[in-house]
Each structure stands twice: as structure tokens, then as C-alpha cells.
Amino acid sequence: MLLKLTKFFMIFLINTTINKFDKNKNRFHCYFENGRDYINRNKKKYDAILSDVFIGENLVLELHSLEAIKRIKESLNPQGIYITNIIGSLSGKYSQNIKNVVKTLKQCFKYIYVFKAQEKNEHQKRQNLIVVAVDQEVHFNIVSYHNINQKRYHQGMIDHVDDIDYTNGRILRDKNLL
């Protein structure tokens, strides 16, 4: 019963989002299935792919392995953007996930940008870390983003981080995930 309620809620949430942000109902697509199965058989090209999947607070490693990232990149248009949400910290006890993901993404994408959702200098606090992977340099205008969304975010809430030491991260591979 819980699974049916969860699936019903997700479908409701997805439909509500599409109705609100995709008025023409032809640009936004959401697939409710095993993500790895989808990217393995996908032949379409997308401008953007967003991944926000977890098992509790843990990564779904099958969608963050080098093999999966290669398939995701093959599913993007040449100037496409891949965005994933990671729960963890930038340093300290909860930082291994972000280090592994950044090191793995660096194998496929030229530029990796990480944004943290907490106040500045909160590198050891567990939080949402938004990772953007692209092949062309991007200059983000965070100030105008905050101005548009004043009611939801305060200045400095989303902060770009460019000093992640991922040297002790490991490249995630399918063969090591078993």
C-alpha cells in the first residue's frame, strides 16, 4: 500500500510540475522507471538531464558510475547540461560521495560546478550539493536568481564552490559497485 501511495504522489507531483512549468506540454518529460535501464536503451538527445535519486541519503551508485555517466553524456545534445543533487558535505565525514561523483564526472565532462545549499563556510555540514556538468564554461548569475526568488532564498543561500579537493575520491565503476 505504501508503494502505491508513493507512486501516486510522485505521479501527482510530476503532473503538477508539468502543468505549472510546461504550458505546451511538449518540452518537459519525466520517466518513472529504473533510471539505469532508461539511459542504457535511450536513443534521444536532451538539452538537460536532471538526476535527483537516493536510497535514503545514499547515492544510487548505478546512476553515478563512469559507465552510467558516459551513457548520460551520450544522451545530451553537444551543449547539453547534466545536473545531479548529492547529499553530503564538502569536507569531513560526509564528503566521500561528492568527491567520488566529481572525480567520476571529470572523466566525461570538461567543467564541473558545485553549488551548496547552506551558508558560506559550512563545508562539513551535510547538505544538498547541486552538481552541474558541462563541456563549455558557464558563468552563473546567482544574484539575479536570488532577486527573482527573494521569498524562498536569502542572499548567499546557494553558493558556488570551486575548491573541492577530490584527489582522494575514486572513480565509480560498475564492476566496483557490486
What is each stretch, according to the model?
Residues 1-84, 91-98, 106-108:
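The AdoMet/dcAdoMet-binding core of the Class I SAM-like
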Residues 111-178:
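Soluble small-group transferase modules, centered on the S-adenosyl donor enzyme superfamily
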